[in-house]
Amino acid sequence: PEASLDRLREGFPLETYRWIVWGRPRPVEAEPVPETLTLTNGTTLRPLPAPGYADDMVCYLAEDHGLLFAADLYITPQPQYLRFDENAPRLIESIHEVLAHDFETVLCAHRGVVEAGRRALSEKVKYMEALRGVVQRRYRYDKVTVPQITDEILGREGLLYWISGGDFSKRNLIASCLDDVPDRTGKIMG
């Protein structure tokens, strides 16, 4: 997306754990994503914006082949962690938007080929909506805190929390489920 071009050209900061694991990205000159891409074999890919894990994430649809190149949209059917900057409500919305298109197989950057990918994404969005509903009820009506809800639903933080300095955590997932919910003072969380 257009919004990413400056970041790609000028570089961007990464948390320490991310550059240790993946290295520091070098600045590159990039072009805006075209309305369609045609591969050398004639396959047409249509970009589908899918923010949630990142504000500039894009999936690619090869409708004639029933394929979705899903970037980080799928990863797992039941997420247990999110980074601090990820947005669960927007991710849910993006999955619904992608499911409005015709595909069966998901090509996932983390899981590889997911044959029943449409069903897998449907299961993921159902899980996330159910999780969000439980979190919102516990917070709003039962007056339970985010740390308490996290421990109840997902358990205590594990190694990923400590390695990432808290950037990648169960608590971030639970807190993100409240991003559009007023806190007890009436201010919108998130």
Language-model segment annotations:
Residues 1-40:
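Active-site HxH/HxHxD metal-binding segment of metal-dependent hydrolases
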